[in-house]
Structure formats: C-alpha cells, structure tokens
C-alpha cells in the first residue's frame, strides 16, 4: 500500500460556503449527450452521506420580485420568538406585497426568503401587527416610496434569485445515474460544470443616498447622508415642531400621542423648555397671538443657557409638559448622525438615555401615575424606589438603573432619598443626561445638602418646576438661578453688588423719596428681568378659565366672639411689647399665638409662646373651656348647608393640625363622614386616601393640612373648599385652594376664605394681597404690577404695630382701606389715580431743597398719607371684579348655600367680598 508522503505545508483554510458550489460534482459517462453542452440538461439526484442540510431544489420560491409597478415594498424587523420582558430585534429585511394579493412575503437583508403571512383585517394596524413568518416574528417598519429606495430593494432581493441556498459541506458526495429521479430539479449541464461564484451581497445602504444607516466618517465610501425625523409632519394634524440650530440634521416633532392632548399654553411651554435645554436663543415673535408651534425656527445658540425654570401657576399642567419633553428627548435627537439609525435613516435613540426626576416623596406616586396615564409604562421604563427597600437595595437599584440601558429610562426619587444614594449617582454621573426637580423652590437655600448634592452631579440639562420660586428674597432667587444656569448672573459677590444692593435700597421705605436710588433700583430690576426671562416661563391660571368650570371666590369676614376679644387683650397686655425694639422675627411667636386665637381660644393653652411668656393659669382654664369662635360657627353652618342643600363634597384646609383636631371632633359630632391628610400620614398611604375620597360618594369631607396640600394633590372629587385660616406665604394658600379647581373637575367650584373681622387675620390677608408684587415683577406678570414703582416693601414698623391692634368697631378693616361704598353687591369701578406722580413730586421736593423742621414734619405727614393711599391701591388692584356685600343691606352672595344659611349667619358674618363665576352671573 502506498502511503502518502507527509509534506509540511501551511494550513489550508476551509472552502467558503457558497463558492465553487459544484466543483465536486462529477457526472457519469451516460450523462453526456451529442447535443451542444450549452443546451443539454441532466437530472441530478444529490445524496448527502453526512450532511443534514437541505437538498438543492430550484422549485420557484414565493417572491414578489416582478417589475410590476403595483408591488409595494417595505422594510421589516424580525426576531425569534422570546418570552423576555424587554424584547429586541435581531435583524432587518424587506417585505413585498402585490396589489393582486393579500399576502406579505418576507426576506432577510441578504434576500433570503423568511416566510409569508396574510394581511391583517384592519389596514390601519398594518405597521402595529406582529406577523408570524416561519420561525420568526416580523413587524413592518417603513414603506419604501422613493424610486431609488425601491431599486435598491429589488437589487438586494434579486441577488438571491436563481441561487438557492447552497448545500452544507459534507465529507462525501456521490452522483448516481442521471435518470430522472422524481424530477427533483433540473439544471443546464453548462451550469453543472461551471465554477459559479456567488456574488457578494452589496448592502442597500451603499447603493443609494437616501435612507442610509450611519457609517463612520472615516469610511472610504462615505457619501452625503440623508436622515428623516421619527414622525412625518405631513401626517400629523397640528404638529408641534421644535426649533433648531443650523447644525440640526432632522426635525424633532412631538409624538402626536401626547401632542394631541396639549393645550395651546402647554404647546408653547414644551417648545420653550426644549429651546432652553438645547441652548437656543429666544426667538423674536412679532405677534404673540399667532401659533408658532407648528413651525421650526432656526435659532442662534445661547451658550449661557442649558436649563429652564417653569414657574407656571398650579393647575396649568407642568407635569404633563415635563413628561412630553422627557419623552421627546428620549426618543428623538436633531443630530441623527451621532446615534444609530434604521435603514430608513430614522434615529433609533434620542438625545437623552437616562433622566433623573427629584420631587417630594408625596409626589413620587403621582409622577409614576402620570407617566402611565399619558404614555403607558410599556413604552417607557420608570423606576421608583420602594419605601420598604434597605439602603443597600436602593443603591443597587440605582446602579442597575444607570448601567442597564434598555430597562429603565427615568428614575423618580424623593429629595431625602437622594442623599442616601448620592454616592452611586456621583460615581456614574456621566450617564445622567437630564435632571428634573419638582417643587424646585425647595432648593432656594444655598447651604442645603440636597442642593449641593445635585450640584455635584454636574448635570448639564436641568428643568425646575415650581409655582412660586421667589417671594421677596433675592438671595434665594440667585441660588435657584445659579443652579439652573451656573454663572449666568456672575458670582454671588458681583450679583449682590450689581443687583441686590441697589434693588434693596430702592425698596427700603427710608429711601422712598431718593430719586437717584429709586431710578438705579428700577434700572437694575429691568436688567435682571432681561437676563432671566430667557429661561423663565411664568403664566397665571387665568389661562384655565376657558377650559375649567367657573369658580366663585368668596371672602367672609366673621365676627369674633367676646371670649376671643378678651383673649386678645390679655395676651397683648401680658406680652409687654416694646415696639421700639420690635421686629417681625422677634414677634413671630406672638403672631402665631394671635392667629390661633382667631381659630379658637381653646388653642391658647398649648401654645409654646403663651407658656413661656404669658402663662396665666386662671385665663388658661377659661380659654380651654371656650372652644368656639366666629369662624367655627360659620364653618359648621356652611358644612351643614352643603350637606343638606347639595350633593357635593367639601375640602376644609387649615395650617394647624390642632385646628383640624377641633374641626374633626365637630364633624364627628354632626355625623359628617370624612377623611384626613396631614403631616402625620405616611407617604405610602396618601395616594389611597385621596383616591378613596375622589371615588367614594359616601365620604363627604376632606380635612387637609395646608402644608400637605401644596404638593400636587388632586381633589377634584370635591367642588367646594373652605380655607379656614391664612398663611403668611400666599403661595401656600393658593396651592391649597387649587386642589379642586384643576383638570378633571366637572362641577362649578366655590372657594370660601374665612377671616376674623378686625383682627390679625385681616392683616395677614392684606399682606397676602400685596406680597406677590416682587414675584410678579421678576417672573413677568405684568398685568397687575405697577411698572413705574420699585417701592415694593410697603410694611414698616408702623405696620408691624398695627398687626397687634384689634378693631372691634368695623365690619371689615380691609373694606375700610379701599372703599366707602354701602356694600350693596355692586362691582366697584376705581378711577386711575395719579398716586405715582404725587410720589415723584414728594421725592424731588425732599431731595432738592433745604427743609425746615416744620416743613419736614408736614412732608412726613404727607408721606404717611401717601403710603396709606398706596397700600389701598395695591389691595384694590387685587380685589378687582369682587362685589362688596354688607349682609345688613344685601343678603344675596351669589351662592345658594350661603344665601340659604343667612338666617343663621346674619349675626356672624359682618362683610363679604364675592367674585362670582360665569354661571352665577348668568343666573342673576
């Protein structure tokens, strides 16, 4: 036996599948005929001794590759069936559909036939249907329309025509006799012996300039690429198209799934926020009444801006606008070449991959529900940390959120929890693309650990949501603005020198007649407004009037009981006040005590200030036995009237849990079913309490702590709200009152504010009516502010003294300040005053000439009169459209509940301001 000689040759690589297919096929002699070889045909029966691969079969496979113009072509995505929660596609391909057929044929990218499936009965769901093709799941992605696209698809599919799948390689191949064995296939003899080399598939993306996938810029064959937006603007009714800069490659269009629900002010808000986060300069809009949201403007870049402050009033839909922006940035980007794209040139990922939402713990559930309501949680992954988690579990969840790309896109976390996971966030801060802070005014303290933690994350794109970001402190204003857009106002030292000092001096009552200081303060105020309006958006809830049911506002002045008057006198005498050294801070405890007396004298004994400064055992015992008050009597009469006269529910709001305790006891005694929410209720129980109240018709009342009611609670199950006492901060009361008059409310709303006549309650109300001036000034509410005046600090020590005075001989001290009408229910029209001109004249006279002591005293008296007139003017502006009603002269209060209860309340209500809703006016 001859043994082959061993030769040390290099390893010969295996033959590539598909090349030289038939070089091993050797026909027998009987296969040769006298006919020309090019025309001869043989019948070959291939047998495989080892391979289990498919036999050669040239029977025509289903395809729709004819040149018929009625054939439609689609791009597809396919995958193997899987039970994974988060499924991905394994490949792309094509589908064809003939006009004369109702069957789709599917092919992979190499032109290999995958299978076919019948069309769905609903043609509208063609692109939503998951087809079954062989062992694959297939979904249509995009229909090819352009001629170049169709040619590319035909060319790709035609590569596999006539070239059946090559047989798998076997160790032995035999070719038996050429007799026709069942007609398995026939081929020309010339093809049998020719060396057929399968052409390498040429990618579709290299055959056309349209709908190309992205390739590296270093590619030798790179050509001009064209990209397309995720949504076709021509197929969307009233689309929202974002603005862009000159470098943008595609338009960013808000998903119509959300866009169709947005109101005009919300459309503008989403576009404004997008511009800020993208660093675009504000566009110049000649006519603000024209809707510009359907057009994309090419704007300049503004390198100072990368964040936004949305300071809209409560109820304008800040959460929905934020979700719309988040969804837009997750799904879309104007820079398509920087992300992976589909075969059609459509970006597959957005500008942001991971977004951090930080909010009060009570709002975490509300945020997640809103995501589910508007988007469905199957579209977007939202992670919240369970309150039952251990710290280690929270840290692990945060790590997984940041490192696992496809599962979750949004993390919602409470401000307090943020501190416990700050280390994990810090390690992976480069993965966080956007930060959203709800109730952003909580970040106004520059020394806050939460604020410093958020600063350390160094997230470029930031969105802050708040109803009232500034009241009267420019230091806090700087802290918030510098966090949103660091450095835009310079350092704090320069900001203080340029803005705080001149503006504060201009607002100081001691400089009210210094023309130079006032002009400089006004100039600096305008300069700051120009800087901040580029990224601050503020709208009032007056926008909602045409969308929500009418609202009637009623301010009721309640006569104090004699026991309350005695309590006021005893406390003020026992306090031994030194008005020369008195400041607001030093008198805060006394102010709180007097507010409690307005609610009920029974609250006096447990007050810390009373125990430490005044304590009188005999008086304390008499107060504890006197739980009733003028406001409590009016409250219980109103509740009884609402329960008997209507089928509506009511919310009762107070700033003190002790007051809620008294009200709760009175409601229990009256048999009024109710639920309660205050600071002692765990966060995880609050959602269920609110849901139960809104849905259960058997629950009549809802007792709410004002501090708990200012964080997004939706109590639309009630249509009447009673604000039992007032807070110094008007935003607290406004937020609490907005709990019922918001989206989802179907009934006309009635808001009652109870004020004790002639006492500190009225002073707080007057303060509220004027305190918004600074907030309005820097946030753009120009309708109510006096543009020519920068003297916003209208309370001095004389005002502080007046806080502790009790007016027992008035029906309403507030009405006495602004009006002298008879209270017959008429809406008072106030003429324009020349108060500003008088003030300017006083300034000039006091600063330009020498003044004697007598003249100085005269000018000081004039100044005091001028200040009183100015206070009256500010209060009057806030009470425009209110009707003035004296119950002794007029018993119609534009509310059937109070009108019907007037017989019982005539001695308890001394005066009323009523701003009726539209329905009330029509009924009159």
UniProtKB/Swiss-Prot annotation:
User: What is one GO biological process annotated to this record?
Assistant: reciprocal meiotic recombination
This protein's source sits in the domain of life called: Eukaryota
Q: Where is this motif: DEGH box?
A: 472-475
Q: Which regions are flagged for Basic and acidic residues bias? A: 1-10
Q: What is its main location?
A: nucleus
Instruction: Give a single Pfam family match.
Output: SNF2-rel_dom
**Annotated PROSITE patterns:** HELICASE_ATP_BIND_1, HELICASE_CTER
Subunit architecture:
Interacts with RAD51 and DMC1.
> Per the similarity annotation, which family is this?
Belongs to the SNF2/RAD54 helicase family.
Name by which UniProt lists this protein: DNA repair and recombination protein RDH54
